[in-house]
Structures are given as structure tokens and as C-alpha cells.
């Protein structure tokens, strides 16, 4: 087990197409969420994108 290999694997994973897609989607979601919070105050986000909450 080597950290060097793990780092290389993580880098490969980070630069993969899937990861890039997830990152851009995540970034868009965060931006939209922040915009909604600023413009609408305490209103909940749309049901199409449920907020991520810890299970109770």
C-alpha cells in the first residue's frame, strides 16, 4: 500500500469525465441554491432538487 499510488488514483478519478460532470453540476446547484437563499430568504428550494439533510 503506497500513498503515491493512492494519490495518482485519486488524481485520475478527479480528472475523469464523470467527476468533471459531477463537479460542474454541483457547482451549478450550489450557485442556484445561494441565489435562491439570497433572493427568497427562508423559502425552501424546489422539490426537483431536494436539500441534502442528515437523517433524523
Curated annotation (Swiss-Prot):
Q: What is its main location?
A: secreted
Superkingdom, taxonomy of origin: Eukaryota
Keyword vocabulary terms for this entry: Antibiotic, Antimicrobial, Cytolysis, Ion transport, Membrane, Secreted, Target cell membrane, Target membrane, Toxin, Transmembrane, Transport
Q: Name one GO biological process term.
A: monoatomic ion transport
User: Where is it localised?
Assistant: Secreted; Target cell membrane
Main function: Causes cytolysis by the formation of pores in the membrane. Causes rapid and reversible paralysis in crickets. Has antibacterial activity on the Gram-negative bacterium E.coli (NBRC 3972) (MIC=0.4-0.8 uM), and the Gram-positive bacteria S.aureus (NBRC 13276) (MIC=13-25 uM) and B.subtilis (NBRC 3009) (MIC=0.8-1.6 uM).
Q: Per the similarity annotation, which family is this?
A: Belongs to the non-disulfide-bridged peptide (NDBP) superfamily. Long chain multifunctional peptide (group 2) family.
Protein name per its UniProtKB record:
Im-1
Give the organism, scientific name: Isometrus maculatus (Lesser brown scorpion)
Amino acid at each position: 500500500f503506497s500513498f503515491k499510488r493512492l494519490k495518482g488514483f485519486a488524481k485520475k478519478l478527479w480528472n475523469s469525465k464523470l467527476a468533471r460532470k459531477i463537479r460542474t453540476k454541483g457547482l451549478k446547484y450550489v450557485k442556484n441554491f445561494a441565489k435562491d437563499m439570497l433572493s427568497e430568504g427562508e423559502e425552501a428550494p424546489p422539490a426537483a432538487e431536494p436539500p441534502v439533510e442528515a437523517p433524523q
